[in-house]
């Protein structure tokens, strides 16, 4: 859980958008309650109550910086940061 909180803090600070690991971003979004659908290299995340659909693609094991910014804006606009502290109930 500490690793997820560290990644969330890093994303919210916005200082290193080019250095966010893709696998960590996927885990964080699932922890926030997003559902994932995969089509090829596109990982599509959606959540009830959130109008935006997040479409992420890995690039050399990292997230693309503009996609990290999109995720940050969704987390801030919908106040999802507190949900990352909740225990993960999905396996």
What function would you assign to each model-found segment?
Residues 2-39, 48-91:
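Basic nucleic-acid-binding interfaces
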């Amino acid at each position: 859980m500490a690793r997820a909180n560290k990644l969330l803090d890093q994303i919210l600070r916005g200082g290193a958008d080019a250095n966010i690991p893709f696998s960590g971003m996927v885990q964080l979004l699932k922890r926030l309650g997003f559902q994932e659908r995969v089509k090829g290299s596109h990982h599509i995340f959606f959540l009830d109550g959130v109008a935006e659909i997040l479409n992420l693609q890995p690039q050399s094991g990292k997230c693309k910086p503009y996609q990290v910014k999109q995720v940050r804006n969704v987390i801030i606009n919908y106040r999802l940061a507190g949900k990352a502290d909740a225990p993960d109930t999905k396996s």
